[in-house]
Amino acid sequence: MSGDGSPEIEVDGSGLRVAVVAARWHAETMDGLLAGARRALEASGVTEVTEVRVPGAFELPVAAARLARAGHDAVVALGVVIRGGTPHFDYVCDAATQGLTQVAVTTGVPIGFGVLTVDNEAQALHRAGLRGSREDKGAEAVLAALETVVALRGVAPLPQG
């Protein structure tokens, strides 16, 4: 859901329990991502929201797994990883992406992927939903997760237990 080709999504999320897990690194960008996520949740009618903060993107999967298993209908993961001069960027991006994918597949709970993997801070800020930003990835991650919950409920609801 990036750039000019992103779909227009409106989802009725009333009655859904949603968790947002957000990293702390890159505070200005994270403030924008969280604000966008909150706006999208409110606009979609979601009133039961749990927010959890973790140190960085590497910690997102374990928190997302715990929240998914705690009965949330969807989990939204927000973070920022900015490329540096070492392979650390690749390791963290891969761990976050693979970890969040594993959580979604093993739990059956949709994960909204709002982890920015960028080359520099300017790219992150342009995607953070701040005044003057080109994109609002926090909101997009929420809408993707909610739309997936609604789509799956119609064809393959999770067993209650």
Swiss-Prot record:
GO terms for biological process, alphabetical: riboflavin biosynthetic process
Stretches of the chain forming a coiled coil according to its record: none
Q: Kindly list the GO CC terms recorded for this protein.
A: cytosol; riboflavin synthase complex
Which InterPro entries does the entry link to? LS (IPR034964), LS/RS (IPR002180), LS/RS_sf (IPR036467)
Which sites bind 5-amino-6-(D-ribitylamino)uracil? 25, 57-59, 80-82, 113
Q: Where is the active site?
A: 88
User: Per its UniProt entry, what is the enzyme's top EC class, as one word?
Assistant: transferase
- Residues involved in (2S)-2-hydroxy-3-oxobutyl phosphate binding: 85-86, 127
> What SUPFAM superfamilies is this protein classified in?
Lumazine synthase
Q: What is its EC number?
A: 2.5.1.78
User: What is this protein's name?
Assistant: 6,7-dimethyl-8-ribityllumazine synthase
